[in-house]
């Protein structure tokens, strides 16, 4: 019989997809410590299922506009700097994309943002970033500089998007259908990178 410490090591090394196997292997073990580990594994599994459902719910807009080939999510990245550029990100994800834990970047830890950045940029059909300098912000104001950064990001995408899901704005000077969504970065899975 394996020690509870060894079983704990097995759980810590187990990938999320292997949790059902872990639970099946140890659920009949009568030891208290092992049952706590099984309960922990079940809690992780329940959280994973809840996250999968949350991601599925986020696909509302992608499903609604399924007739479009390249749906792009676009958002500014931390608009409102006192000193620094305004940055906008645009991304087109594949239609079958299921990246877990995507969320508004302000809702994520720095570590999780970095992990998701790596996954998103690897999985994306296309992604790009646009910038407007502090000097440009001073010239045209923060909102116009944000639009400029967004247009730059959109212009860098290849393939070009045929639909934009925007976080609460309509970007002037863009001849692509736009759907401005209030709190958009929380409501669809095509986020901007970082």
Short names for language-model regions:
Residues 170-176:
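Short loop/helix-cap segments at secondary-structure boundaries that form the rim of catalytic
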Residues 129-131, 180, 189:
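Structural signal for conserved beta-strand scaffold positions within catalytic alpha/beta enzyme cores
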Residues 46-83:
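Long amphipathic N-terminal alpha/beta scaffold segment
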Residues 6, 13-61:
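Conserved catalytic/binding loops enriched for acidic/polar residues
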Residues 70-77, 81-161, 168-170:
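Contiguous, small/hydrophobic- and glycine-enriched helical/loop subdomains that border
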Residues 72, 178-183:
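Short pre-catalytic strand/loop immediately N-terminal to key active-site residues, enriched for Gly-Thr
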Residues 188-194:
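Conserved small/polar residues in nucleotide/adenosyl-binding loops
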């Amino acid at each position: 019989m394996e020690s509870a410490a060894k079983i704990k090591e097995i759980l810590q090394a187990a990938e999320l997809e292997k949790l059902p196997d872990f639970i099946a292997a140890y659920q009949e073990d009568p030891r208290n410590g092992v049952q706590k580990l099984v309960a922990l594994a079940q809690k992780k599994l329940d959280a994973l299922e809840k996250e999968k459902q949350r991601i599925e719910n986020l696909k509302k807009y992608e499903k609604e506009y399924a007739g479009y080939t390249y749906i792009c999510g676009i958002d500014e990245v931390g608009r409102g700097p006192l000193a620094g550029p305004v940055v906008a990100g645009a991304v087109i994800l594949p239609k079958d994309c299921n990246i877990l834990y995507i969320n508004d970047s302000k809702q994520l830890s720095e570590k999780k943002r970095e992990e998701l950045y790596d996954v998103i940029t690897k999985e994306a059909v296309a992604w790009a970033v646009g910038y407007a300098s502090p000097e440009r912000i001073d010239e045209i104001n923060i909102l116009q500089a944000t639009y400029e950064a967004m247009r730059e990001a959109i212009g860098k995408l290849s393939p070009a998007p045929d639909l934009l899901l925007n976080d609460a704005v309509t970007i002037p000077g863009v001849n692509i259908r736009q759907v401005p969504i209030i709190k958009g970065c929380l409501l669809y899975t095509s986020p901007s990178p970082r």
